[in-house]
């Protein structure tokens, strides 16, 4: 799959997000080493600790299907800023693919690419919501 196709797959997931509380949709598309792609969206719950991010949705789908070698993930949002993964998602990604490429999209479709290990300075906080 091309980078553009992977980006389109992540953007397509924005409409599937279940976000009645934050109104902050996120979509993700995860590419495995064998070319298989798993997508995900964020899914919120009134018990906020039960909420799951788009990135972890895609990763957990992949792992549950026997995939553990990840090449890259695209994370899409609708805000002006690039949609970067939260700390929990970064930790889960580090468990499986510390050198994975992370492509962050903003609402205008612009992309910024990082290696997972490069992300820690770019935090996610309440100002994003």
What are these regions (language model features)?
Residues 2-16, 67-129:
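C-terminal binding/interaction regions
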Residues 19-22:
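Short loop/turn motifs at secondary-structure junctions and domain boundaries
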Residues 42-57:
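Compact, glycine-rich, soluble single-domain proteins
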Residues 25-32:
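Short beta-strand scaffold segments in enzyme catalytic cores
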């Amino acid at each position: 799959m091309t980078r553009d196709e992977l980006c389109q797959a992540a953007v397509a997931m924005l409409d599937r997000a279940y976000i009645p509380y934050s109104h902050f949709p996120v979509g993700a598309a995860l590419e495995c080493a064998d070319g298989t792609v798993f997508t995900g969206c964020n899914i919120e719950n009134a018990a906020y600790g039960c909420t799951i991010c788009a990135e972890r949705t895609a990763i957990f789908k992949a792992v549950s299907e026997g995939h553990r070698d990840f090449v890259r993930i695209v994370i899409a949002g609708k805000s002006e800023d690039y949609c970067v993964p939260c700390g929990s998602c970064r930790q889960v990604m580090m468990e499986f693919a510390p050198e994975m490429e992370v492509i962050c999209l903003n609402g205008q479709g612009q992309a910024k690419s990082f290696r997972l290990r490069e992300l820690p300075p770019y935090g996610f906080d309440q100002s994003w919501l």
